């Protein structure tokens, strides 16, 4: 079996490695000590998952939250190649028509990509491990589990069993039995209310007190209480509310600054009244936070805690949002400088349940090259998992979006597993499949995709997909707040009038 080293300077080297037999099939790997310096990426066992046009079977390819998981059948098609640089599930599969194999990545998981390729009728699927010229932080290792069952659900079942036995996951029912806060939340529908925000994307890249755009109030704390009352009148028993934009200057207003509570919504006094009221109605209530980005308009902004590149520059994020230009926070410094105190302060307001931390399981894990707090991707994953474990301890649960499964053992709910389930398919996509759902149903709660939130007001296809793929009901007020970016669907829930709450 072959591996290929592609170096930063353009050199390419190939070598053979020997597989090691195991009860489940075999495993193969490369010790980190045997990986030379200066490697850009490693193409691993590129000669193993191979087929020819006309063969029976398929490739199973988890591409990431943008595209979900696809099947590629071995039919005649033009030459093409696709590189998925961010793979949110740590596996990939091959069915020959007679047997199936799933590769489970157990070493260098956080630096995993997948390459799909067709050239002159020959199909290839292999993992690519990104080293970026740095030393490998751990061994590259992949286990190959074989089965005579050729259905993709069998491969999902193998990965599910692996995650439950070796991946640290436990069933939701077991966790809920051990923590009444999680039990209460897991029994409830999720209701997400976007309360306040500045224009997004912001017309002002670098904001300060003089040029900061005004906050738009979408739902005051008093009005949120009226939404809770309306739910109670309809005899809805189990709900967990999540407030987005409760913090100073609203959604993504001045992160990592949270306080004071946004005054235009009613401030801290009205927020505490709301929390007490909602809990008095028998409902849960949590809030939306962030642990990855810093806006220069924050009163605590400091380049000290930002991610540094190899060139010692700070790492700006590509998405311009309500607070203007965000910069990536070093995961270690986020935990040390902000999360412990922030969660304590948020809990003191009264929030309890499945706490939401934005984007933590949908973004590629950053490397930090600051000599005072350097972090490779494996270390970054551990710092983020510390945040998740702290969230569970303080509030009762942790949630984010998309479900990048380096964090599967510490995640209770994901807002959506990927974006659209059905969209224009590319040359290598023949079918979308619910791999995340088959693996994690009953372990992690989820909404199937962005287009199945608010499913009662969506079209028939979205409603059916919601039930078929086993979602946690999710209602979102003011989902479409960003100009021209209705990525949660065109349909929305509004709260301006009493009629809209009926």
What are the roles of these predicted feature ranges?
Residues 187-340, 352, 361-372:
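Aromatic-lined carbohydrate-binding/catalytic grooves of carbohydrate-active enzymes
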Residues 1-240, 284, 490-493:
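Carbohydrate-recognition beta-sandwich/jelly-roll modules
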Residues 97-102, 107-153, 212, 306-319, ...:
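Active-site-proximal substrate-binding groove within the catalytic cores of carbohydrate-active enzymes
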Residues 36, 51-54, 234-237, 280-282, ...:
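Structural alpha-beta junctions
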Residues 38-40, 52, 251, 295-297, ...:
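Short acidic, gly/pro-rich beta-turn/loop elements at beta-sheet edges
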